[in-house]
């Protein structure tokens, strides 16, 4: 698996040079005509997006002051932290439960365990397409988190038929599916100043990673497997916080626009 993943990074890296459209000031002309490039630049200007050079932002007191005196860095960081901590699938609960049944060999457990991330791919496509074409950002995030909440409730109760547990484990990747919606929306709110956007996104991910690092160790202790009552309750609480924070984000976004 590690060899396959390593090889795929080369494929992605090479593909990026060929397929990535570039930036407004340094576009790739392999797929875009000059007319299309000019249209892209015009649309950016109409939406108030800076389309200048893409040099790394220079940190200054003025830049930091503008970031930390604005609501975005605080609200978006909190939103992102709740999102990072509402996903339980990273701790192997599905595989540990399958193994605890004593019905399958290790290879069979690994094979069956593929179902959850496989469904997760479908959820990612559905949630992100529905965000643009049907439900909108708020609706798609609500759908992802409500599905996750249903999964967490079943796993917290635990004393349910095995079929219910199968269902719960195979829908709990739904919360991950909203990742692109969250970061796309965040980028949209930060689009007016690229320096502030870059620093704010780094802060969001740094704080979220730090919170994720300790929360998993505390809430999903392997010795408690296969029933992570504390962990699933923690994930449920964070899903509820994601839902609540999303409404706050929408309010400030509308006010900004």
Each language-model region and where it sits:
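Extracytoplasmic gate region of multi-pass secondary transporters
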Residues: 59-129, 212-217
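A late C-terminal transmembrane helix in Major Facilitator Superfamily
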Residues: 194-228, 234-238
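Hydrophobic alpha-helical transmembrane and interfacial-helix anchor sites in secondary transporters
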Residues: 130, 186, 222-223, 231
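Transmembrane alpha-helical cores of Major Facilitator Superfamily
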Residues: 3, 81, 114-118, 146, ...
